[in-house]
């Protein structure tokens, strides 16, 4: 199937599947097959923020006064988050847009990816405000084995989907010889690559950020590195929305009533999908041990974080129809919820530091029924 940026072939977008149908031609939003994506777009747009709005002058003083083990925790998490959002700032667009078939999902993916670029810009804003030479931090990211071991498991699923999709668009289905290697391209393989990639992205949004989030908020609970925590809170709010997006995509694919023709793919990939979750949770536990190798911090240690990883892994897997792999427990760090539930608060923006302010939240649609009790 040859990809085109604008198909002249008329089609009914309400009858197209989310993926592998006809390429989107007219980006129309008056009719939508899955209006959940429109709601996600509206929510993400209302969340718009810039890292420069947050004052980090006190954070520099706080960072200089941190003991060496806490500096290691703080900087290591920033390195890892920078890498994750560097991947997420480009990969959803490259991997998913060429195979998307409905405009609302296409626009959600573009909106999602754009917000990820704000996150990666935020880490630069934080690092250059607390360290004289940011290059010391950034140059270590690629060479740090503890970071790259985890990143590899994320990028491999994106890369495989991108590679197979490129062959499909260029050569079509069939058996091909590429660089002296035999390659079979078919829709079944493409669907498998898509589903596993979506699972991997869901795991990234669901689990991989939360060790870093917990550490940032633990610092702020002690009233230090508070500017950083305000930025991370905004990032966490966005990531929760992105997680909701991938959960909806996966649950739509899982539901036979939606005619997405993914039933067999979901069943065939189930075991591997579960392994992706379990592997990610084990990697995050390993990361927690790496962070706390030189000592714990007040209110948080590797054991508590490992319990938290199991707790959120259970919740995330259950949300997309998988069994909970770990013993069901309560949240070992319940105080984190006040940091993660910030989008429910609406505050007046007298100060630039307000981290829960939403824009574009006026309801402009009014029906005739709204005036039925009015008398003139």
From Swiss-Prot:
Annotated positions binding Fe cation 1: 85, 116, 119
Binding site for Fe cation 2: 116, 205, 239, 242
Reactions catalysed, as given in the entry: a 2'-deoxyribonucleoside 5'-diphosphate + [thioredoxin]-disulfide + H2O = a ribonucleoside 5'-diphosphate + [thioredoxin]-dithiol
Record note on cofactor: Binds 2 iron ions per subunit.
Cofactor field: Fe cation
Leading EC class: oxidoreductase
Single GO MF descriptor: ribonucleoside-diphosphate reductase activity, thioredoxin disulfide as acceptor
Gene3D superfamilies tied to this protein: Ribonucleotide Reductase, subunit A
Keyword Metal-binding: yes
UniProt EC number: 1.17.4.1
BP terms from Gene Ontology: deoxyribonucleotide biosynthetic process
Active site, renumbered: 123
Keywords assigned by UniProt, alphabetized: Deoxyribonucleotide synthesis, Iron, Metal-binding, Oxidoreductase
Protein family according to the UniProt entry: Belongs to the ribonucleoside diphosphate reductase small chain family.
Function according to Swiss-Prot or TrEMBL: Provides the precursors necessary for DNA synthesis. Catalyzes the biosynthesis of deoxyribonucleotides from the corresponding ribonucleotides.
Subunit composition and interactions: Tetramer of two alpha and two beta subunits.
Protein name: Ribonucleoside-diphosphate reductase subunit beta
């Amino acid at each position: 199937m040859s990809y085109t940026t604008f198909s002249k072939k008329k089609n009914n977008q309400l009858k197209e599947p989310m993926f592998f149908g006809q390429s989107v031609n007219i980006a129309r939003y008056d009719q939508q097959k899955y209006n959940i994506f429109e709601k996600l777009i509206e929510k993400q747009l209302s969340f718009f923020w810039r890292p420069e709005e947050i004052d980090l002058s006190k954070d520099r003083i706080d960072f200089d006064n941190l003991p060496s083990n806490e500096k290691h925790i703080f900087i290591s998490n920033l390195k890892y988050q920078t890498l994750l959002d560097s991947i997420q700032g480009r990969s959803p667009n490259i991997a998913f847009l060429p195979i998307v078939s409905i405009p609302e999902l296409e626009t959600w993916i573009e909106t999602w990816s754009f917000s990820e670029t704000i996150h990666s810009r935020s880490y630069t804003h934080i690092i250059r405000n607390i360290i004289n030479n940011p290059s010391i931090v950034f140059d270590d990211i690629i060479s740090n084995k503890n970071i790259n071991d985890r990143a590899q498991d994320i990028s491999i699923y994106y890369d495989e989907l991108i590679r197979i999709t490129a062959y499909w668009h260029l050569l079509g289905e069939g058996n091909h010889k590429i660089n002296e290697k035999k390659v079979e391209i078919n829709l079944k393989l493409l669907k498998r690559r898509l589903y596993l990639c979506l699972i991997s992205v869901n795991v990234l949004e669901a689990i991989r950020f939360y060790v870093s989030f917990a550490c940032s908020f633990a610092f702020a609970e002690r009233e230090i590195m508070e500017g950083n925590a305000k930025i991370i809170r905004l990032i966490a709010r966005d990531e929760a929305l992105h997680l909701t997006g991938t959960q909806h995509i996966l649950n739509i694919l899982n539901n036979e009533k939606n005619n997405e023709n993914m039933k067999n793919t979901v069943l065939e990939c189930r075991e591997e999908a579960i392994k992706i979750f379990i592997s990610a949770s084990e990697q995050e536990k390993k990361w927690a041990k790496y962070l706390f190798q030189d000592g714990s911090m007040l209110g948080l240690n590797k054991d508590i974080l490992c319990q938290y990883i199991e707790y959120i892994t259970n919740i995330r897997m259950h949300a997309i129809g998988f069994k909970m792999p770990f013993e069901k427990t309560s949240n070992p760090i319940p105080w984190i919820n006040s940091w993660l539930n910030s989008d429910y608060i609406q505050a007046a923006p007298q100060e630039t530091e307000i981290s829960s302010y939403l824009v574009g939240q006026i309801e402009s649609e009014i029906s005739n029924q709204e005036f039925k009790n009015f008398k003139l």
